[in-house]
Amino acid sequence: MRDVKYVDAHCHIEDKAFNKNRDEVIERAKKEDVIIVTSGASLGGCLRALELRKKYNIYLTLGYHPSRVKADDKVIEKVYNLIKNNEYEILAIGEIGMDIKDENYKRQEEIFKKFLSLAEELNKPIVVHARGFERKIFDIAKDKVDIMFHCYSGDVELAKEIGKEGHLISISTLVCFSEHHKKLVESLDLEYLTTETDSPYLSPIKGTKNEPKNVKLVIEEIAKIKEMEVEEVKDVIYKNTCKFFKRRL
């Protein structure tokens, strides 16, 4: 079987948490043959992500996190225009979506639909943050664009429906220690999945920041659960992710 790379389909290498060691983190990922897709989720994060793409030749998505909906409309409009003006630099729009833990669901939905319309206009897939709103987000967007459910934590039956409809479930480093996420992997066809770290969050190693190289642990855990070879899992995940982003990575 040909040698393929690991894919961290969603992380935040532009996060300020990496300011002191970003070079080393990216170098460690490259040494482990990890493809990095970083996700700008605020105005500042999107601007930093664009700069990092130029410097490190990594991939990116740009969006606006639902936790930031209290921001002034002018800020949201700046992010909107930034995405529109950099459509050829991005793989997808995201992360965007809704979160049950944040307030003002109506405004969250309005902002999500604004960026969803932009994705339709630009013919881009979306990467969604949908904690507590998995069904709602799916019903709104499923017939409009391709969807990747970042760090999916919803129920198994909805995940199966998402996969059968041709959308993608992203399995994060939570699978290394969460029984629910192990059950998701056990229950879902591998063709429905991609992998991520959500770095610097969700570290599988206690007391450390997460980083893209740890996506290897996700692949290894999936292989263990599925009773498959690591290389076979890598290959399928890579193909799934390239298909979703509509390009070879």
Swiss-Prot record:
This is Uncharacterized metal-dependent hydrolase MJ1582. The keyword Membrane does not apply. It is an enzyme of class 3 (hydrolase). Belongs to the metallo-dependent hydrolases superfamily. TatD-type hydrolase family. Its cofactor is a divalent metal cation. Keywords: Hydrolase, Metal-binding. It comes from Methanocaldococcus jannaschii (strain ATCC 43067 / DSM 2661 / JAL-1 / JCM 10045 / NBRC 100440) (Methanococcus jannaschii). NCBIfam families: YchF/TatD family DNA exonuclease. GO terms for molecular function: DNA nuclease activity; metal ion binding. Its EC number is 3.1.-.-. A divalent metal cation 1 binds at residues 10, 12, 95, 198. It holds the Pfam family TatD_DNase. A divalent metal cation 2 binds at residues 95, 129, 150. Binds 2 divalent metal cations per subunit.
